[in-house]
């Protein structure tokens, strides 16, 4: 069974990215399948994973927009998930800020519950 952890805090500079990256690395080293999701428009976790947020064509924003548009997010998953240093991750960039505003203005409708069970985190 997959375990889902969210590392959150509304304050910046408290170690969310560092904690997430190090926890992911430790779990990967222990043989666990790890999927990290960068949910920050600044793309700090994406940078830690050695990707340039500005150069990425497919990111978390594509996946979230697909869900909001009721299209198939599966079309973007294989393109958005990147493998780096033995860890899979979904990158983020400034396009995620636009998704945030869409979420705020969206009707209160339940989103479909889809989950890929290949990952431990």
Model-predicted regions and their roles:
Residues 1-121:
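P-loop NTP-binding core
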């Amino acid at each position: 069974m997959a375990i889902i952890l969210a590392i959150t805090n509304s304050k910046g500079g408290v170690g969310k990215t560092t904690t997430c990256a190090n926890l992911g690395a430790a779990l990967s080293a222990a043989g666990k399948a790890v999927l990290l999701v960068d949910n920050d428009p600044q793309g700090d976790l994406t940078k830690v994973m050695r990707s340039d947020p500005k150069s990425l064509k497919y990111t978390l924003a594509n996946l979230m927009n697909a869900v909001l548009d009721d299209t198939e997010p599966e079309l973007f998953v294989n393109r958005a998930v990147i493998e780096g240093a033995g860890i899979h991750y979904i990158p983020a960039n400034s396009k995620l800020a636009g998704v945030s505003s869409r979420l705020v203005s969206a009707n209160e409708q339940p989103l479909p519950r889809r989950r890929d069970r290949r990952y431990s985190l």
